[in-house]
Swiss-Prot record:
Start-end of Basic and acidic residues biased regions: 1-12
Top-level taxon of origin: Bacteria
Function, in words: Regulates the dynamic behavior of MamK filaments; paralog LimJ also promotes MamK turnover. At least one other protein besides MamJ and LimJ is required for MamK turnover. May connect magnetosomes to MamK filaments. Moves from the cell poles towards midcell; movement does not depend on the treadmilling ability of MamK, suggesting MamJ associates and disassociates continuously from the MamK filament.
Family: Belongs to the magnetosome MamJ protein family.
Main location: other
Domain text: The center of the protein encodes 8.6 repetitions of a Glu-rich sequence.
Bias kind Gly residues: ranges: 13-25
Residue windows of the Acidic repeat 8. repeats: 342-355
Subcellular location per the Swiss-Prot or TrEMBL entry: Magnetosome
Descriptive protein name: Magnetosome-associated protein MamJ
Note: This bacteria makes up to 20 cubo-octahedral magnetosomes of about 45 nm in diameter which contain membrane-bound crystals of magnetite (Fe(3)O(4)). Expression of just the minimal mamAB gene cluster (amb0961 to amb0978), including this gene, is sufficient to form a minimal magnetosome chain with small magnetite particles.
Amino acid sequence: MANNRRDRDKGDGSQGEGLSAGGGMPSEPEIVSVTVHPTPTLAVSLKPAQQGDIWASLLESSPWSANHGGRIEPVQPSPAPTRPTESPSVGDLVSRWSQPIWRTPSRVEEVETPESNFVIELEASQPITSDITVSVSDLVIEVQPIQTTEAEPEPELPVAEPEPGVVPVDVVAEAEPEPELPVAEPEPGVVPVDVVAEAEPEPELPVAEPEPEVVPVDVVAEAEPEPELPVAEPEPEVVPVDVVAEAEPEPELPVAEPEPEVVPVDVVAEAEPEPELPVAAPEPEVLPVEVVAEAEPEPELPVAAPEPEVLPVEVVAEAEPEPELPVAAPEPEVVPVDVVAEAEPEPELPVAEPELVHEAAVSEPVAESIEDAVAVPAPATNFGLAELMQAAAAMAPVLASPPSVAPAAKPVREPAKKRKAPPVRKKVATVQDVPVEDLLGGIFGIAGSAVRSVLSLGAGVVGGVVKGGRVIGDNVVAGARRLTGSAEGSCGTCSTSQCDTVGKKK
């Protein structure tokens, strides 16, 4: 019995292969039903047998016994073809001899194992009693593998594929999330049978299985600093607060800018009258103008005398009275001249008519005909010297022609030359850009001159009144004396004229 169990445990190394291939997990037993049919030629010995002899005979004739009494071998599935022996690589050796903690059982390897455990159930057509002796060699064993429902978890095989068993120990710790490395799965079938003795620490494997699950905990710990990054993000939000603080002095800069703008305000106030007369002039030049204006208290004096004094002072000051020139009376004098110039072509018409020479008058002296024909118009009273000069110039070519040159055959009429009227010179008011200072100085000068003229007129009136008062007073005194003289007595030879002269002398 003990030998049979030992041999059954050893088998052909299938269990050891299963342990080595499955990472220490025993393969599930495959149930096989065996029906035993005793042959009709089976001799049944009626010899009483002692209790236990039937079991001894069965064990001795069984193919699993030590003496191999029976020759009948059970029908077993053909073993899988053995792979050619290859020199194991370093990765295979590491995956084989590494600690079982990094290896998980693979159901694929369990399915690929050529051999598995069998549980034989004997069914006899006749009840076997202690009186019946059955020989195993006379039995016909029919092996019918039965697929139980426990063998159906094959679809769960892909779930157990993430096996990092091929990767070395150091690399597996980093490559744990790589479940796509089932390349070295068929290799565990080459493991020798001696590994079975080393499979004793296999019960520790299920305990160590949850350890790889602890590795993701480290990954979670690494993911914990990620929420710390957004915690540092609000810190730059405080930076805009500093920027706002820096932006506060910015309005102060524009406050300093308008300060230089206040200086042009005075210029703008001065520039308001500039649209009227935009010419700029230096301010210090106005001062001598005022001095010159004060030097003109005598408008009645000849103007030529003070002019040379004003010229060296300032030429611009002299240009100020120019606007007063158009106000003078010479302008209406120019108007009639233009009207007379338009009437000039009228006397020229009779001058061109005497040029016609008739045949009947050829024998007459040409000079007389010319003198008779040329009718010199009487100068108009409105003609000026310039108009008379132009009329004389028009008559000069007619008088200069010799008398013998006149044609004798046919009269030749020359086209009358129309002289163009002299262009009417229209006096265009010159617009000058006068600076504000000069304008103000001129205004003040005009006002001062007007005041001075008023004062002079007032002085003249006062003087006249005084003089008239004196004359009137003298006349009154003379009259009073005459009256007093007539009242006292006649003057005799004294006449009134003498009294008047006496009064005047007094």
